């Protein structure tokens, strides 16, 4: 008799996605981050739901409602810090997941890659809005600075900013709409994740060698479910260590001060996971140019499949491309460090050099190195 999981319409869907899914036998731990991102999303939605039960999205009460959650709600301090540090872990997994896609050439699955980029944008937007909700100094000024970038758009910029703010400055209407969107977007992210998986399962997973693996597949369960559970346990160990031993390690002390429109913090900066893009924004002296560079720093990912000149999919056997890949990673780390520094010499110069190197590496050096490698292997 055929198993229920193979006949029941709902079970069949789960079976084809998580149990009998044919998976390459040689995928490494770098393929764990997809499931970890799913775990992050579940953690964020769950903790966020409990926080929303006690949060008040109004400029006069938001800050005190956060204090109330931390002090008076049972395990409120833990739920709050799990949510804040969960966002940091989410972005660590996200960056590693994208990095793996770049290294092993997973971007050749176009629909999966492009939905992934939309997911990245949506997650960044959700995280930014979440950062505004505690209504501390950095929340308020971060919201003011970043939303103000819309004013760089010709003709409609100023009207657009006032429309987003719901007034002539960041105030209660801004906070209310940001809370509404911050609550709603994770469910859109969940829907996009389902699409991402749907398109991935159309083509099947890539593997470290970058070659077709149709002749050598194994079932997802039990082999990769066990592997993913191990990854999940290590992830939870890191998250709980961060949350319980050093909950404020990645947050800004200024956010423990109530938002004050009359007092500007000495150094306005976003959360650490946006610092690389913030550094690129600040490295351009012109406002519109900076906004365009900021958008392009993420949108450049859409050009990667078109810039892929190599005859090999993966970088496993391409030492020249590997060198440029790690140069790009080092460059992004420098940009992240610079984004947290004040706007003064020598940081301005470093950020301009690092930003130029970022775009040059992706647009020119990597395609050129691929062509050189093809020529060296006489694959031209």
Swiss-Prot record:
> Tell me, which GO biological process terms does this entry list?
mitochondrial electron transport, ubiquinol to cytochrome c
Q: Which cysteines are joined by disulfide bonds?
A: none
Cofactor, how bound (note): Binds 2 heme b groups non-covalently.
Q: Provide the Gene Ontology terms for cellular component.
A: mitochondrial inner membrane; respiratory chain complex III
**What cofactor is this protein dependent on?**
heme b
Residue numbers binding heme b b562: 83, 182
Q: Name one GO molecular function term.
A: metal ion binding
The cellular location(s) given in this protein's UniProt record come to: Mitochondrion inner membrane
Keywords, A to Z, come to: Electron transport, Heme, Iron, Membrane, Metal-binding, Mitochondrion, Mitochondrion inner membrane, Respiratory chain, Transmembrane, Transmembrane helix, Transport, Ubiquinone
Xref: Pfam families: Cytochrom_B_C, Cytochrome_B
**Binding partners and assembly:** The cytochrome bc1 complex contains 11 subunits: 3 respiratory subunits (MT-CYB, CYC1 and UQCRFS1), 2 core proteins (UQCRC1 and UQCRC2) and 6 low-molecular weight proteins (UQCRH/QCR6, UQCRB/QCR7, UQCRQ/QCR8, UQCR10/QCR9, UQCR11/QCR10 and a cleavage product of UQCRFS1). This cytochrome bc1 complex then forms a dimer.
Record's miscellaneous remark: Heme 1 (or BL or b562) is low-potential and absorbs at about 562 nm, and heme 2 (or BH or b566) is high-potential and absorbs at about 566 nm.
Q: What is this protein called?
A: Cytochrome b
Specify the taxonomic lineage. Answer: Eukaryota, Metazoa, Chordata, Craniata, Vertebrata
């Amino acid at each position: 008799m055929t198993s229920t999981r193979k006949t029941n319409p709902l079970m069949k869907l789960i079976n084809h996605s998580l149990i009998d899914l044919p998976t390459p036998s040689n995928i490494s731990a770098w393929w764990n981050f997809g499931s970890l991102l799913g775990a992050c999303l579940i953690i964020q939605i769950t903790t966020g739901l409990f926080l929303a039960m006690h949060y008040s999205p109004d400029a006069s009460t938001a800050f005190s409602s956060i204090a109330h959650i931390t002090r008076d709600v049972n395990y409120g301090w833990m739920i709050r810090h799990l949510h804040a540090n969960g966002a940091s872990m989410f972005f660590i997994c996200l960056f590693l997941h994208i990095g793996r896609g770049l290294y092993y050439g997973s971007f050749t699955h176009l629909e999966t890659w492009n939905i992934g980029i939309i997911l990245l944008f949506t997650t960044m937007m959700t995280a930014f809005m979440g950062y505004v909700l505690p209504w501390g100094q950095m929340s308020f000024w971060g919201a003011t600075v970043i939303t103000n970038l819309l004013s760089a758009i010709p003709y409609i910029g100023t009207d657009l900013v006032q429309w987003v703010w719901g007034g002539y400055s960041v105030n209660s209407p801004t906070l209310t709409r940001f809370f509404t969107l911050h609550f709603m977007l994770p469910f859109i992210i969940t829907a996009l994740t389902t699409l991402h998986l749907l398109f991935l399962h159309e083509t099947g997973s890539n593997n470290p060698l970058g070659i077709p693996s149709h002749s050598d597949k194994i079932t997802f369960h039990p082999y990769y479910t066990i592997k993913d559970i191990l990854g999940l346990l290590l992830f939870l160990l890191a998250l709980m260590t961060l949350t319980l031993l050093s909950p404020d390690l990645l947050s800004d002390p200024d956010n423990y001060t109530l938002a004050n429109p009359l007092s500007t913090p000495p150094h306005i900066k976003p959360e650490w996971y946006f610092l690389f893009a913030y550094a690129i924004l600040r490295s351009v002296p012109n406002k519109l140019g900076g906004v365009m560079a900021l958008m392009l720093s993420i949108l450049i990912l859409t050009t990667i499949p078109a810039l892929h000149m190599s005859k090999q999919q993966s970088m496993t056997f391409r030492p020249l491309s590997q060198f440029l890949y790690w140069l790009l990673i080092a460059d992004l780390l420098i940009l992240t460090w610079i984004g947290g520094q004040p706007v003064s010499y020598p940081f301005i110069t470093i950020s301009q050099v690092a930003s130029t190197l970022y775009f040059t590496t992706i647009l020119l050096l990597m395609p050129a190195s691929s062509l050189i490698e093809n020529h060296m292997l006489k694959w031209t």
